[in-house]
A protein has these predicted regions:
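Active-site-proximal mixed secondary-structure blocks
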Residues: 1-31, 37-129
Length: 129
């Protein structure tokens, strides 16, 4: 059955985007991002609050990865999005997820997830990165 949402700027269903970075001390960090999408033919854009540790990590290192959750890891990825890395520094391990260094950028990738975009920060503005 079709549903009319009126004029909106969002798409459904939205994938769960897991953004991973390295913290200052080199430990992996991850957060779920609800707002992101295609910016150009070879760029994506994320809308992240400046309050997130992940945002600071991206600005400091200039790199991050974006993975998309799959059905097999939905519960683990949901946990990553619900728990703050400031309160639970090992939240990836507690979720049963493991990371390895990305091939082309200074950021981790989550081994269990089938897709990872390796990204470099091109620009930052108050509308998103």
């Amino acid at each position: 059955m079709r549903k009319n949402f009126g004029k909106k700027t969002w798409l459904y269903p939205m994938p769960v985007l897991i953004v991973t970075t390295y913290n200052e001390d080199g430990t992996p960090n991850a957060m779920n991002a609800a707002w992101g999408g295609v910016y150009d033919t070879d760029q994506i854009m994320l809308c992240l609050s400046q309050d997130h540790r992940t945002t600071g990590n991206i600005r400091a290192r200039g790199a991050f990865t974006v993975s998309i959750a799959d059905a097999a890891h939905a519960e683990a990825c949901d946990y990553v999005g619900m728990v703050s890395g400031r309160k639970v520094p090992d939240k990836l391990a507690r979720a049963g997820l493991h990371t390895e260094r990305a091939e082309t950028v200074d950021a981790p990738v989550i081994r269990e997830l089938p897709l990872a975009l390796e990204c470099r920060l091109v620009r930052f503005n108050e509308d998103g990165i």
